[in-house]
């Protein structure tokens, strides 16, 4: 197996980082005082813009225990890949692709019915281009590239539009799951109430039987 550091970064389960050795119980006990000292030092060094590197070099091990700030460039690297801080789906034009469906307005961005209509239009266009591709292949097979590219563009637009629809799909799936759980809990409550009623009726029947037996006159002996 290769010992290339790049392979370790992009592997599924990379080894722990080297600074994990600083996460000791002793350092955790020193961390609160170090944070206070570092904050006070930052206030003192901020006006004159002095360099406090010497102190940080002495206690640099405790810096690894402090969570890093949010990245300023809206990107971060994890497992060898670059991720966006804000999970936002880029539009097709920014990726250099042709967008066939119309852009959603502010009112349409939350109205997912228009996305369903656009999906139906794209599906019809896909079927039409597929039939045209079959016709081109039967007449002049060398002219298939343009139709294949059109089909590819339509499929990319369908896939992108489906990704825009996923937030609504997730909410609806969550609503359905909660409704199923609610109905299941209601069914359990109904069954518990039914069993409680049966137990209550049984106890009432036993009490009536005992009461009737105690009130009956004793039989006279001959």
Swiss-Prot record:
GO terms for biological process: negative regulation of transcription by RNA polymerase II; positive regulation of transcription by RNA polymerase II; positive regulation of transcription elongation by RNA polymerase II; positive regulation of transcription initiation by RNA polymerase II; regulation of transcription by RNA polymerase II; RNA polymerase II preinitiation complex assembly. Keywords: Activator, Nucleus, Transcription, Transcription regulation. It is found in: Nucleus. Residues 34-55 are annotated as: Disordered. GO terms for molecular function: transcription coactivator activity. Residues 42-53 have a biased composition (Polar residues). The keyword Transferase does not apply. One of its GO terms (cellular component) is mediator complex. Its main location: nucleus. Gene3D superfamilies: 6.10.140.1520, 6.10.140.200. It comes from the Eukaryota. Belongs to the Mediator complex subunit 7 family. Present with 7598 molecules/cell in log phase SD medium. Component of the Mediator complex, a coactivator involved in the regulated transcription of nearly all RNA polymerase II-dependent genes. Mediator functions as a bridge to convey information from gene-specific regulatory proteins to the basal RNA polymerase II transcription machinery. The Mediator complex, having a compact conformation in its free form, is recruited to promoters by direct interactions with regulatory proteins and serves for the assembly of a functional preinitiation complex with RNA polymerase II and the general transcription factors. Component of the Mediator complex, which is composed of at least 21 subunits that form three structurally distinct submodules. The Mediator head module contains MED6, MED8, MED11, SRB4/MED17, SRB5/MED18, ROX3/MED19, SRB2/MED20 and SRB6/MED22, the middle module contains MED1, MED4, NUT1/MED5, MED7, CSE2/MED9, NUT2/MED10, SRB7/MED21 and SOH1/MED31, and the tail module contains MED2, PGD1/MED3, RGR1/MED14, GAL11/MED15 and SIN4/MED16. The head and the middle modules interact directly with RNA polymerase II, whereas the elongated tail module interacts with gene-specific regulatory proteins. This is Mediator of RNA polymerase II transcription subunit 7. It comes from Saccharomyces cerevisiae (strain ATCC 204508 / S288c). The lineage of its organism: Eukaryota, Fungi, Dikarya, Ascomycota, Saccharomycotina. The gene is MED7.
